[in-house]
Amino acid sequence: VLTKLEVGQRCSEITRSQEIDSGGTALRADLFLAVDVPLPWPKPVFNHQLLMGVEELLSNHSFPLRLVASVPENNNALTLTAYTLNDDSLNRQQWVFNPPDLSSLLERVLEGQTIEGFEEVPQEEQKRELWICTQGSHDVCCGSEGTSLALEASTKFSEVEIRRVSHLGGHRFAPTAITFPERRMWSHLNMEDLQTIFGVSSIDDKLTRKCRGWCGSKTGAEQVAEREGLKIYGRDWDRYVRKSEIISEENSEIRVQVDGIHPESRSQVGFEAVLQEVEKTPVLSCDKAGSIPNKWQTQYEIKKVNVHS
């Protein structure tokens, strides 16, 4: 495994060529917020004039959340989109805001208050959405590969809302994205992958390996274990109300219990995944080329899966 990125090398190309597994690197969040922020975006994006004070506002809340900037469709009608988890179901809401009022709107959303004084955008049922990281100021791979995929996807998937968003973590896995309402993150995506994800055909093992994780499970072993559900139950697995939990850790062996309840039949399923920590790979970054990485990612291998009948 390459331990240092040379100047001129791209982190996503190296990670792809070395077949580094992105499993376990997804965000852990129950609330996702996308704020329309006009380009260009600085690094970090919170230094943008529109987002001044927002990072401090978010730090006052301890529940898992992620706020990203989103390229506006209309700079004169900026929106805030929120995906909130209520009783295991994901709700999408959207409001139009004036820049001086953003903090006030965010505060109400974060506190779970009734939103008054802001125009709410009517929502379509079961909207499919893709947030692709395209922040070139954070990493050249997301800026180039992410933007290219987002623009092509926008012309091919009319029924899916494609958003170009700021840093989602894992730029070494560009193009990287998150799908809604599934809350599943993906790595090294291409158009063929998106056709499968937004289509009806089964998700094969090759595409499952591109899954960074489901954002309802903790980062690391739990996310690697949870994605095995895609192999066992197929794409219907994303409809189950799921929970995962590490039940034992001994030496480098980890046991994870994953349970799911079908939303309609209420039938319960579950499995135990036995994982092995096999190695640690460097977190490569284009903007740190030439220097030794200071972050490392644990690679896991699934040893066996025991499905409960």
Task: Tell me what each language-model feature is.
Residues 1-309:
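Histidine/cysteine-enriched polar flanking segments
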